[in-house]
From Swiss-Prot:
This protein has been found to bind carbohydrates, since it shows a substantial delay in elution profile in size-exclusion chromatography. The carbohydrate pocket ovelaps with the lipid-binding module of actinoporins. An N-(acyl)-sphingosylphosphocholine 3 binds at residues 116, 137. Has been engineered for DNA analysis in nanopore technology. Residues 105-120 are annotated as: Trp-rich region, which is important for the binding to lipid membrane. Keywords: Cytolysis, Ion transport, Lipid-binding, Membrane, Nematocyst, Secreted, Target cell membrane, Target membrane, Toxin, Transmembrane, Transport. It comes from Actinia fragacea (Strawberry anemone). This is DELTA-actitoxin-Afr1a. An N-(acyl)-sphingosylphosphocholine 1 binds at residues 31, 79, 168. GO terms for cellular component: extracellular region; nematocyst; other organism cell membrane; pore complex. The record marks 16, 149, 163 as: Part of the hydrophobic cavity (in subunit A) that receives Val-60 from the adjacent subunit (B).
Length: 179
């Protein structure tokens, strides 16, 4: 099946079943995430980078994501007996010259933290880094991973709709569409 992290699939095929398949491929890991981002923006996206605040991925970001396609990606806590989650930001350059950034946060300790996610368009090309992480996590009204759908205008003629569950085995599904 092509429903593996690092693949690009038809956007219409993105859903919970696909993301569960991506998640299960990570095996028995306490904190992990499957990410699916559907490109209905009318633009082509080119991978820039992933910045991990904690955790890692063995997957290379899909390089090109055409309009009508969706990228699949995953992340997991660092291997070994370390008390970390998987927290990071994905950055894609869009064919209009701007950057699509997606934050995901799956904490280790649910007594203190919750799942969070965010999506934003930055003017110009910006690689994901610590500053972008801090802005998306602390200052740009992130959404809680609360098992519900959330929508937001992104500017630049775009809007987003996304869902994240509250589990340590997290799924994050985002659709970026024309406004």
């Amino acid at each position: 099946s092509a429903d593996v992290a690092g693949a690009v699939i038809d956007g219409a095929g993105l859903g919970f079943d696909v993301l569960k398949t991506v998640l299960e491929a990570l095996g028995n890991v306490k904190r992990k995430i499957a990410v699916g981002i559907d490109n209905e923006s009318g633009k082509t996206w080119t991978a820039m980078n992933t910045y991990f605040r904690s955790g890692t991925s063995d997957i290379v970001l899909p390089h090109k994501v055409a309009h009508g396609k969706a990228l699949l990606y995953n992340g997991q806590k660092n291997r070994g007996p370390v008390a970390t989650g998987v927290v990071g930001v994905i950055a894609y350059s869009m064919s209009d010259g701007n950057t699509l950034a997606v934050l995901f946060s799956v904490p280790y300790d649910y007594n203190w933290y919750s799942n969070w996610w965010n999506v934003r368009v930055y003017k110009g090309q910006k690689r994901a880094d610590q500053r972008m992480y801090e802005e998306l996590y602390y200052h740009r009204s992130p959404f809680r991973g609360d098992n519900g759908w959330h929508s937001r205008g992104l500017g630049y003629g775009l809007k987003s709709r996304g869902f994240m569950n509250s589990s340590g085995h997290a799924i994050l599904e985002i659709h970026v569409t024309k406004a």
